[in-house]
Amino acid sequence: MFFLLASLLLAFPSTGTELPHLKFNGFLRFNYNYSDWKEGSKKRGGDFGYDLFKLGVAGSYKKILLDVDFRFYAKPSGGAMLKSGWIGYKFNARHQLQAGLTRVPFGIQPYGAHNYFFQIAYYLGLEDDSDMGIKYLYAGDRWEYAFAFFKNSEEELFGSDSETAGDRYSYDVAGRNKEVNQFNGQAFYQWGDETRQKIGASAEFGMLYNLDTEKNGTHYAFAVHHELYWKGLSLKTQISTYAMYPKNKPGESRDIVTMTAFNAPYEVAAKANIYSVSAGYTIPFSKGIVNSIQFYNDFGWMQKWDKSFHDSFQNVTGCLITAGPVLCYVDYAQGLHQPWFGPDWNAFGAGTGSNAWHARFNISLGYYF
């Protein structure tokens, strides 16, 4: 579809009339994965295979904007999916409006970590999340802020009793509850030249519609965050809290909710605090094929409000090697009660499975264009 659209635009004769501008981007990535809790993987010495192909489009026509990020994962991980896609209006260099599947303004932007796996907040739907709605953004010299209303998360089925589909990139509430009517606000203040700093705060409030009781529960989240950049150093810190109050039918727990992405739903504690610290240092190279290497360590802690639950932790140590259009992430990811880094897939819930730290060694190799 993207190539057809580009062909049609190129077919227009040159009449002096302003035409839409389109620019394509994307990447192809492969992954090597060695997980210490998977006996088969250990005996094989790990596995190397296809990760994903991304095709993106950035477009403009006068003051109208277009941005599309479409992902092609393996079929078991959700297959083809729209990560984000919106139509916007640029009032001027500082004010912009976006409508569609647009990024939720919450937490450090665009990411709170340096590694391939993001921060722990991503797996709880509070980092790199996009939902269906409308968003206003302002970007000044010192201040930046955003306000948004999201009608719901990515909706695909449109049935009166349809659960949230699992073939999505970002984590959303699923099962018998659905995210609806969500408001977000975010503000940043930045200063400094040689040493740049940025502080910010984020707030979120919305409803959880239960398909069984047909009643609306509520959910909220707040965060404060700070970023520091000095020469090659990058330091990102964030404190977040969230709570979900679903209106489930009698007999169903309200202390755990279901969230889903990549066709793999799991249980998550309904209330928790999140603490994260991410540090990186970049070394540039002026000769040879390698442009730079960034070393980093990113730590995240999910502190669950329910004292009978076990907290979740993750720590990722690694480096990003950049050689022109080729990016290579080399990560040693450790987790305690973290489903992506351990044997218990519902560890973000009660966390009553393995009480040992587990590790995943991962290499992501990609060509970006």
State the predicted function of each range.
Residues L22-L28, L66-V68, L97-A99, Y145-F147, ...:
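Transmembrane beta-strands of outer-membrane beta-barrel proteins
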Residues E18-P20, K62-K63, A93, D141-R142, ...:
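Short coil turns and loop connectors of transmembrane beta-barrels in diderm outer membranes
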Residues V277-A279, N355-F369:
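Outer-membrane beta-barrel "beta-signal"
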Residues L8-N25, W37-E39, I289, G324, ...:
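Outer-membrane beta-barrel biogenesis signature
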Residues T17-S35, K42-E156, F188-G192, S276, ...:
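Outer membrane beta-barrel
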Residues N31-E39, R71-S77, F106-I108, A113, ...:
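Sequence/structural signature of outer-membrane beta-barrel proteins
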